[in-house]
Amino acid sequence: MKETVIRKLEGLMERYEEVQALLGEPNVVSDQDKFRALTREYSQLGEVVAGFQQYQQAEADLQAIEEMLSGDDAEMKAMAQEELAEAKQLIERVEAELQVLLLPKDPKDDSNCFLEIRAGAGGDEAAIFAGDLFRMYSKYSERRGWRMEIMSTSDGEHGGYKEIIVRMEGDSVYGIMKFESGGHRVQRVPETESQGRVHTSACTVMVLPEIPEKEIPEINPADLRIDTFRASGAGGQHINKTDSAIRITHIPTGTVVECQDERSQHKNKARAMSVLAARLAQQEEDKRRAEADSTRRSILSTGDRSDRIRTYNYPQGRVSDHRINLTLYRLSEVMEGDLDSLLKPLQQEYQADQLAALSENN
């Protein structure tokens, strides 16, 4: 391993011990924001430190084996020769794992996020599929111990949703869910299809990191048009009595956000502004990423409907992720929330792309 990398790892080990000490200080324990941030850092550093300690032990073991090989004892030399290849393989594996752990982290990966699902081509069947996707993400969220909160819904005429916006909260939510942005296509026989023909419908999914309230940039009020209207759909007796629903239009970009899930107009406006800030920030990020490197393919999609990332084929029980040419014949398990079988290979491919980019830059 390069000396510069070892020095970096030694520095991270020192920081790990420093954070460990800080977490025991009363002024840190009493400051919940600082305590949470340090706890998260301690957990992340712990993985790197454990890997580095394993590397140090493997290097020490290899050195001992090489000393045995240079000795005069024939029996010890034979035993050391058997262990040599295994020791070298272990060092290579641990080095590769440390390389991944040292990849630059996107600070947004630890953020909560907004999940937006919209029905696309396919009419009623697309809306029903949007409902199926929401259920799939809800099941996955339960498995991971995340919390989901519905921000806004527009119901489909025969079930499902024309649009649903959800806030997701928990450990590394955005870092894991960001791979879901893009076009999702379903191939199946709709319940209303009497001839048994397979139809193709589509939905778009957008995953946006939530911007902390303190970091939301000022938006010029002159750039906003705010409309109130009566909420529609299921929701109890208060529905249609007051204009509590909010629609905010960002005039320069044409971005529109609606929120109608709360009874309070003030709460709906605050929620809509939060989603709007996330969308505007993502638009800037997409533009920056495109300008920075238009030649390199990216597993991360912009969430554009033309960017089809996955197909769910019900007759064959198949789900295919087109970004990494992955096909699994376990559609029912995926729809019940087993998304890790798709997301983990995507994360590995993304890390491989990052490593390749670092190598090119170096």
UniProtKB/Swiss-Prot annotation:
This is Peptide chain release factor 1. Its main location: cytoplasm. Belongs to the prokaryotic/mitochondrial release factor family. InterPro entries: PCRF, Pep_chain_release_fac_I, Pep_chain_release_fac_I_sf, Prokaryotic/Mito_RF, RF-1. Methylated by PrmC. Methylation increases the termination efficiency of RF1. It comes from the Bacteria. Keywords: Cytoplasm, Methylation, Protein biosynthesis. The gene is prfA. The modification N5-methylglutamine is found at Q237. Peptide chain release factor 1 directs the termination of translation in response to the peptide chain termination codons UAG and UAA. It comes from Tolumonas auensis (strain DSM 9187 / NBRC 110442 / TA 4). Coiled coil: none annotated. The lineage of its organism: Bacteria, Pseudomonadati, Pseudomonadota, Gammaproteobacteria, Aeromonadales. PANTHER family: LD18447P. One of its GO terms (molecular function) is translation release factor activity, codon specific.
